[in-house]
Amino acid sequence: MKFFLYGDHLNPTQLKRRAPEHQFLMLATLPEHTIKFCRWSSQWRCGLASVTPSPGEQVWGAIFDVTDEDLKLMDCFEEDVPPNTFRQVQVSVLTEAGEKILVTTYAANPIGKFKPKAHYLDWVMKGLKHWKLPEEAIETWKSYAPQ
């Protein structure tokens, strides 16, 4: 299954643990969406990132091929947060070559507005740099840093 991952899901340590058989396919953007921190994480003690519709914006991430076993593991980790916190949704992403691909991703059921903390953003940055996302993506995530 083709899965679009973004944010903390891109961290290689986390990805190996949650989807050990994943295969990187390509970088992509989710058009007409942005990142919001609309769920609280007791593990991170801060807001968790989720994609949400937003005209004119885009979210950088990567497309991975994940196995059924990977998907079961990923869903188990998503269930570590309260039930129905995240759901799988089908979205169309754009590859760097401009090709539109239908994929699955996780989106949160929002409950409020929260702020990320530096340690969470550092974890995200490790993933962005590992997969060589463009500077635009890195700058966007830097802009979420607490002031």
Residue ranges and their predicted role:
Residues M1-Q147:
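Glycine-aromatic micro-motifs
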